[in-house]
Structure formats: C-alpha cells, structure tokens
C-alpha cells in the first residue's frame, strides 16, 4: 500500500513497525469504533490521532509541519514530504516513508480497520 494512502489502523501499525513494536495485532471493534491494540490491556496505539504518542515522535525525529491550505497539512523529514488533513496524519506518513519507504506491506486484516 502506498504510504500516502495509509490511514487509521494501517498507519498506526506502520508507525509501530518504525518504533520497533513487533507484537502486532489485531483490529477489533468497541462500540462500533475500530481500534488497533498492541497487546491488551495496554492503551490503544494511535499516534496518527493521539498527540501524546504522535507528538513525541514528531519532536524526537524533528519532523517539520506547516499548514499548507485551509484543509491540508504538509510534513517534511529526511527529503520526504507528505500531506494530509491533519498534522498528525501528515507527520506519521512522513515518518513511515522515511523509515519504510513509499510503499508498505500492511497486514490484510488492518485494511478494513480504517478511521480518521
């Protein structure tokens, strides 16, 4: 899957791979909301929507972010540039691309587990 198209559980999984979190998982639904967990009962890993998780990566990696237009954020890291509707999604796509490349093999079960 193209890194540019990663969202939700697939993007969070790819970030986990970059972070060395190898115990992947699963997608399950709670109150009709798809969630991806590292291993229960740990907190949900959502760096593409959780500033405490994604913000730490942005700061550590030195990912640059700026508002490109009213509805688009751009991110830069190591010669990679990615955009998205939120700064966290843009930054996490950029991070994944810098570590794993412009295409990522995502487990099939995570492809239907999309949220943004």
Model-predicted segments: where are they?
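Glycine-rich anion-binding surface patch
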Residues: 1-116
